[in-house]
């Protein structure tokens, strides 16, 4: 199963770099979730729809993939994310995405986004714009 986990993480990073949100959503279980520092817990499909609506382009530079020891059902993708939002602002940060897989499958049940940005105030402003999109409201919350 570890080979499958690694393949999922690499496919995720490739799809994110290509802004291919349909492929990303296909990696998740139907009720999969994403927890974001700025948006909180929300359904994965809604999170990636919202991200896609706010994104002009992505450049993903993989750094490493961390696989579990034993029979644990999680793995971590570590990468540099150069995110260009629709207004043209470029936000660059390193990310460690913690994937939790559904038992006996290679479907992502939960994704926890772990990152820091060099300019948190600017990043929060961009994420607030992202979270304020009424057409994509999903019950997620924006952090202050």
Regions found by a protein language model. Name each.
Residues 18-74:
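A solvent-exposed, acidic/Ser-Thr-rich amphipathic alpha-helical stretch
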């Amino acid at each position: 199963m570890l080979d499958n986990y690694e393949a999922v993480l690499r496919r995720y990073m490739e799809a994110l770099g290509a802004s291919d949100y349909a492929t990303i959503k296909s990696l998740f279980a139907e009720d999969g979730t994403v927890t974001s520092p700025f948006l909180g817990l929300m359904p994965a499909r809604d999170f990636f729809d919202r991200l896609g609506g706010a994104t002009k382009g992505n450049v993903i530079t993989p750094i490493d993939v961390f696989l579990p020891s034993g029979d644990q059902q999680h793995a971590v993708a570590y990468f540099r994310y150069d995110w260009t939002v629709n207004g043209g602002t470029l936000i660059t940060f390193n990310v460690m995405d913690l994937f939790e897989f559904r038992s006996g499958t290679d479907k992502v049940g939960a994704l926890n986004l772990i990152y820091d940005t060099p300019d948190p105030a600017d990043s929060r402003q961009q994420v607030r714009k992202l979270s304020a999109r009424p057409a994509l409201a999903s019950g997620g919350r924006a952090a202050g």
